[in-house]
């Protein structure tokens, strides 16, 4: 009986993992409409599974997800392209839950250059800069 319960629990956990991964890695948590976000980079991470920026903007500090590093680096946005203290302008999608200061960026404009970190996604807004 214990062995059966353990197997059932493991099977349910295995089924739940892909759903959790899709919730984080997908776009369902974001608004459909594109928007802009500008501010100053507080920190930037070029690690897997997604690059990440903490961005100080007028309404607070935002958590910004970008593409996986390999995709961003193909656009030219890799280590050295941006650093803490740089001003940045983003286009992308904010969280559907407006209590969260969370944003998923499609383009990053920093130091006079625009990087399309999600080149496969259609875009309605043109980057500023």
Walk through the language-model features, giving the residues of each.
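Extended, charge-rich, solvent-exposed interface segments
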Residues: 115-129
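Bacterial N-terminal signal peptides that target proteins for export
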Residues: 1-10
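Short nucleic-acid-contacting surface segments enriched for D/E, G, S/T with interspersed K/R
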Residues: 74-90
């Amino acid at each position: 009986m214990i062995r059966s319960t353990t197997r059932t629990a493991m099977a349910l956990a295995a089924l739940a993992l892909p759903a959790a991964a899709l919730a984080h890695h997908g776009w369902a948590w974001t608004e459909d409409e594109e928007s802009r976000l500008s501010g100053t980079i507080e920190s930037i991470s070029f690690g897997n599974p997604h690059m990440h920026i903490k961005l100080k903007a007028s309404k607070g500090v935002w958590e910004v997800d970008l593409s996986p590093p390999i995709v961003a680096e193909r656009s030219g946005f890799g280590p050295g392209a941006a650093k803490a203290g740089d001003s940045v302008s983003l286009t992308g999608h904010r969280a559907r839950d407006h209590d969260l200061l969370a944003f998923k960026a499609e383009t990053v404009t920093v130091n006079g250059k625009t990087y399309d970190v999600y080149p496969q996604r259609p875009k309605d807004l043109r980057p500023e800069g």
